[in-house]
Amino acid sequence: MGLTIAQKIIKEHLLKGEMTAGSEIALRIDQTLTQDATGTMAYLEFETMGIDRVRTERSVAYIDHNTLQSGFENADDHRFIQSIAKKHGIYFSRPGNGICHQVHLERFGIPGKTLIGSDSHTPTGGGIGMLAFGAGGLDVAVAMGGGAYYITMPKMIKVNLTGKLRPFVTAKDVSLEILRILSVKGGVGYIIEWGGEGIQSLSVPERATITNMGTELGATTSIFPSDDVTKAFLEAEGRGADWKPLASDPDAEYDRIIDIDLSTLEPLIAKPHSPDNIAKVSELKGTKVDQVCIGSCTNSSLYDMLKVAALLKGKTISPEVSLSISPGSKQVLAMLADCGALSDILASGARVLECACGPCIGMGFSPNSAGVSLRTFNRNFEGRSGTADGKVYLVSPETAVAAALTGYITDPTMLGEMPKVEVPKQFKIDDSAIITPASPEEAKDLEILRGPNIKKFPDAKPQEDELSAELVLKVGDNITTDHIMPAGAKILPYRSNIPYLSQFCFGVCDKTFPARAQEAGQSIIVGGANYGQGSSREHAALVPLYLGVRAVITKSFARIHIANLINAGIMPLTFQNPDDYEKIDQGDKLTIKNIYAGMESGAMTLIDETKGLEIPLACAFTDRQIAILKAGSLLAYTKEENA
């Protein structure tokens, strides 16, 4: 039997385990990336390992999230990251150089390599043929130290693309179509591999848009072949030597095959407040729009920006709409300036923002009260924009421009003929904003710079054989890490300060949670299906740990979050019968006995002391995960292993 693209890369990097779906495997990691909202914690964790220099082929620290410096906190954290990067062999991408995934694609991505990043949209690298995973910061820290990255061997979905996209229909619409087909839970446990003759018409940035939003499916990762299109992109970046061909075997087997004819697609839109709440743009025409944001790691490439500039050229945006443009990198911005496209954007009335994440994470440009905001981003979770009652829709750059010009949701095909856009065969290369690390000899004398906002992370709490605790919070389905640990301009600067962050934990769901959790001492959370979807932020585990949460019981978990819970020492459990979720209530006193035996057998019993009920629970821990929980955290376990 032949192998898929992903299976070939896994086989080449396999350190432990068997390539059997559902079993645990350990992978050698070639590259890592961090961003500053999660990176500070990752580097604090790396420091505690006592390793002088990273042991990956390439590790890069990006500053792209906390670029709004309204106080000392972000600037201090950036100095810390820059100093630790220089000392420990990590490349440092300065603020303003661009969004981590866009810059990594441009300057560091290599087909066939493995990459993990402390950002859930790291699978963007799949657009260039990398096996790229989003992970918690602790997993990234371990990988930087030369440790393996452990995952459950995924199943495989093949998406066959045929035909070509029509004018005004884009890669973003392909992403929204697969979300319509699979939903935000449909990719859990799968790697999604894209192929078929239709991919030949998709550039690397378009492919990266699609793999980027594979994260919204819950997929382990997504990947495209490495072909002549990939080669042309790398040559344009002056990195032709990094190219190698990569394709699935003709007799490769997949667990599911989905066929999409690109020529049949039309402009799509994701309505509030979920990326899979899909409709045709034409069905919502006439909806008044207050704000339009174009950019993010999903749609900020040179190709996207050139199309936006061409559509805006000679026109003026609606006086009722505020339009922001965030180029994905300094390279993109410089090339827009060189060819005159930036002038066309400015002349239209658009506001050009820094090359950073910005509005996507609620870092500025929040919509007005109850405002309708069309965004070319990847998530539209409630409150994520920074406006609690904001209504965020996800669209392509073309649909975004149509709304900016008309003031209403408008099918972009109504704009007339799509202007022809030519991407240069050679990109402008300027790596002056990427700081290379010091040599091992120079690094010995370098000091790590720490600001007062950097606090110690929570101590490990070894899992005991019995747990008695209050059910301090009960939540529903599709709880995101934005619900658990919100982002935004007011909170993100404190990502290195767990005690301060704790007062915002679950604030979207229940503002009384932090105080009640601390009063309880130790507690349990109960959730519905797909608990922990969204961002890879390990703070959604570390902050509940700090507040005394010892177990989370749900109908099901998102992949990255369940790993982060285990890494933090919080026990993730599921109901054997999902209907039992309805039987227990917030405030109930709960007990779980014989936990160690249950970890081994995969079954435990939850005793609801308040109601006199016994409820069967399930778990599926590997021997390694059991050892992590007993040690209290992945960090404590790693220290024990290296002692």
What are these language model-derived features?
Residues 1-643:
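Fe-S-dependent hydro-lyases/dehydratases of central metabolism
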